[in-house]
Amino acid sequence: MNRRTLLTGLASLPVLPLFSGFTLAADSPLSAQPPTRLAHPPSYWRDKVSAEAWKVLFEEATERPGSSPLDQFYEPGNYLCAACYLPLFRSEDKYDSGTGWPSFTQPIEGALGTKLDFRLLWPRTEYHCARCGGHQGHVFNDGPAPLGKRWCNNGVALRFVPADQPLPPLRG
């Protein structure tokens, strides 16, 4: 890559967020058969989740690292979207990434959609619940083998259901 190409690319970074609502941020389901997407506005969920969860899920905030009890929690079960209760992750895919957030090697197929996030200037892959659209976290390419992915989740955006308990009905 020559210097001119590099400088042109760097100079264009500040305008990329202006276009992210079109091609760069289009939801891309992780499976050919994602769950049916709900049409509720974010305000629908405000009285169904905590204020902190609502900020993360529907304003795309991030909880402080180390603040979630789910970070160092390793019981068998399933991790659901805190808003609509769609199962997102299985406990056997959870691992300690050392980041201070619950991390997983892979989601349940079809449970999440992704989009590019440019809030820190460089692109990151953000992921959302495929059903209610609630923001969960970001996926990085520094996870353990064999998949090499780290699905880094906000704990407040999750609800854990132990393996010996039935899953609650979907909400919404």
Question: Where are the language model's segments positioned?
Answer:
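N-terminal secretory signal peptides and thylakoid transit peptides that target proteins
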Residues: 1-17
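C-terminal segment of N-terminal export signals and the immediately downstream linker at the start
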Residues: 18-56, 64, 168, 172
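N-terminal post-signal-peptidase region of extra-cytosolic proteins
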Residues: 57-74
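Mid-length scaffold segments of soluble, non-membrane domains
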Residues: 74-103
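Short cysteine-rich clusters marking metal-coordination/redox-active sites
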Residues: 81, 129-132
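Cys/His-coordinated zinc-binding microdomains
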Residues: 85, 133, 156
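Short, non-ligating residues that shape and space the ligands of small metal-coordination modules
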Residues: 90-91, 138-139, 161
